[in-house]
Every structure is written in C-alpha cells, then in structure tokens.
C-alpha cells in the first residue's frame, strides 16, 4: 500500500488493486479509516474524532490530487506524494 502523505502521526495510503468506489486509507496508532474521494464520505473508521477531522480537512484540500492518484493506481502507475496538512 503506497503511502501518499503523512502528517500528525497519520499515514495516508492507497492500494493499487483496490476495488469499489474511489477511496483512500488513513492509519494512525489509535485507529484507521477508509474514506471515499468523490464525496469524502467516511466508509469505515476507528480513528479518534480529532484525527478523523484532520484527515477530512486534508482530503478536502487535496480532493483533485486524490482523484488523480486513484486513476494512477487503477492504471498501475506510480502514485504522487501529496502535501501534508500544515
């Protein structure tokens, strides 16, 4: 699972062979989440509320880049790093 961003102890990644709606994964020591890219719907999450808010704020800022990376992943291409939340 290629890592595309890291911030505040959170790792953002995408699988090359993932299926279903375009989405990304967020991992933290205290949990993880799976989030749709098109509407930022939380599909599944065990992240604490604070970390989830950070992830959603970051995703809103980088939604276009996430979509581009999803297309790259589907094509088996190398994913681009995305700026962390500052």
Kindly give the residue locations of the regions a language model identified:
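Basic nucleic-acid-binding interfaces
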Residues: 1-86
């Amino acid at each position: 699972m290629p890592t595309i961003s890291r911030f505040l102890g959170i790792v953002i990644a995408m699988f090359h062979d993932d299926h279903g709606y375009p989405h990304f994964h967020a991992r933290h020591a205290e949990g993880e989440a799976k989030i749709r890219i098109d509407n930022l719907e939380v599909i599944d999450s065990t992240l604490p509320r604070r970390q989830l808010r950070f992830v959603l704020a970051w995703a809103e800022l980088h939604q276009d880049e996430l979509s581009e990376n999803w297309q790259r992943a589907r094509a088996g291409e190398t994913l681009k790093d995305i700026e962390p939340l500052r």
